[in-house]
Amino acid sequence: MEEEVAALVIDNGSGMCKAGFAGDDAPRAVFPSIVGRPRHHGIMIGMGQKDSYVGDEAQSKRGILTLRYPIEHGVVTNWDDMEKIWHHTFYNELRVAPEEHPVLLTEAPINPKSNREKMTQIVFETFNAPAFYVSIQAVLSLYASGRTTGIVLDSGDGVTHVVPIYEGFSLPHAIARVDMAGRDLTDYLMKILAERGYTFSTTAEREIVRDIKEKLCYVALDFEQEIQTASQSSSLEKSYELPDGQVITIGNERFRAPEALFQPSVLGLESGGIHVTTFNSIMKCDVDVRKDLYGNIVMSGGTTMYPGISDRMQKEITALAPSSMKVKIIAPPERKYSVWIGGSILASLSTFQQMWISKQEYDESGPSIVHRKCF
């Protein structure tokens, strides 16, 4: 028996790409899903200027580049750039030959059919992988929490999904998608900091605001109460040092920004908050499975990392649910990477090995095989 070849697991998010080997407990590579191209061509001849940069390198050279995110709201919109990101993942980050490893990719729930086919085609035709599988992100997060039934609230940088899952299958009619996630909260924080007199406008400055958000923001258990506390004392204020050494102070912005998750109306959005969306999704499911869903509400993705979010969610859902219902929020500490971790678990299961689409099957049936083998 030759040595088992590890499968490659790649979770392509709107904001960050997480990649690594099946069986590992964390991704080896985490980098921004960005492709940057020089704004001006060939000013410095012989400077070895590349025509495109990916990930951290694009981020560090952002001053001279135009940055683009090929994944918007969880769905791939630019395939040329997406191919560059995968190329970078295989050859520069993981340093592997894709033609030697099975590849597991993740996709957003309710991803258009044509997108899955295009993904399949690129993996087999451009990268010559021996085998391929595509899995729904929320389902992988649920596996990572050790469950096969539950409702997943997956909120990343570009999109938020609520996905009820029963015995390993998502229930498509009850899936909800909200185009509000980390990127929108960063924008909102930029806006309310501007009202305090701190203006951040360029794409480079936006990254600073994202850092402020990740380090200092939290979700209030009682928003009105917290606003009152903040106005009466400086106990909630925190200071932050900007890259140039200037120190700024932020107060109620710390909890006003993430409050948009529960009150999207502050962003001018019509959708209900994440608690209402979750409740509505449960109500669209069969009455017999609701108890299992209320008792297994699983948080996943970077935008669920705010301190206080679980307690607030518990409070809000309990208020909406039938009075005797047991509501349980599961927020694993590693939830930022739980989609990837679920993929790592799935791809290393012995029972999963017959699930892969092989190169041979692809050659015989073409890209549409993905709909028959991956669900």
Swiss-Prot record:
Entries under SMART domains matching the protein: ACTIN
E.C. number(s) listed in UniProt: 3.6.4.-
Lineage of the species this protein comes from: Eukaryota, Fungi, Dikarya, Ascomycota, Pezizomycotina
Main location: cytoplasm
Function: Actins are highly conserved proteins that are involved in various types of cell motility and are ubiquitously expressed in all eukaryotic cells.
SUPFAM superfamilies to which the protein is assigned, alphabetical: Actin-like ATPase domain
Catalytic activity: ATP + H2O = ADP + phosphate + H(+)
Subcellular location: Cytoplasm, Cytoskeleton
Protein's recorded name: Actin
Highest taxon in the source lineage: Eukaryota
Keywords assigned: ATP-binding, Cytoplasm, Cytoskeleton, Hydrolase, Nucleotide-binding
Ranges in a coiled coil: none
A cellular-component GO term for this protein: cytoskeleton
Family: Belongs to the actin family.
Sample GO molecular function, one term: ATP binding
